[in-house]
Amino acid sequence: MAVSLFQGDGHGRSGVVFGVKDRMNFYAAVMDLSRQMLQVIRVVAGQESVIGQAALKPKLVDWHTLRVQRNTIISKDFIEAFFDGQLTLSVEDQALGLGQIGLVVRGTTSAQFDSFHAAPLYSHRPFSPPAAY
């Protein structure tokens, strides 16, 4: 999934939620431009855990892109977060399965979102039909 976002003044985080079972069980990938930090958070039974974080080097523009994808490589699930087109964070986690997606703002900041879209990632489907020989 990917979204363009503008984070307003104040202290807080904005981003996407995914793997949502309910309001007590989900993942979130959130950016905090005031601290220049990107975090991947796991919430299980209402308990928040930061499972990965990385420093950001934001471009001097108002709008930024945040993309998150979940990959499976040899039965290991990875969450990859991209900020402004660059892979910024990759974490391995299998605690939560698939679920709903959405947008999130936490703290005293405001945010504007645009061009939010999601698509399934098929890693085992061929890009072309089998050869005709």
Region annotations inferred by a language model:
Residues 93-133:
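Ligand-recognition surfaces built from glycine- and aromatic
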Residues 24-26, 47-53, 86-91, 126:
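Surface-exposed loop/edge segments in extracytoplasmic proteins
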Residues 55, 80-105:
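Short, solvent-exposed beta-strand-to-loop segments that form ligand-recognition rims
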Residues 44-67:
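Short, aromatic/His-centered strand-loop micro-motif at the edge of beta-sheets
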Residues 1-3, 61-73, 77-81:
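Short tryptophan-centered beta-strand motifs in secreted/extracellular beta-sheet-rich domains
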Residues 1-43, 106:
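Secretory/extracellular carbohydrate-interaction modules
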Residues 12-14, 27, 36-38, 70, ...:
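Short beta-strand/loop motifs in extracellular/secreted proteins, especially
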Residues 16, 28, 51-58, 91, ...:
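Beta-strand-rich interaction surfaces with strong enrichment in secreted/lumenal proteins
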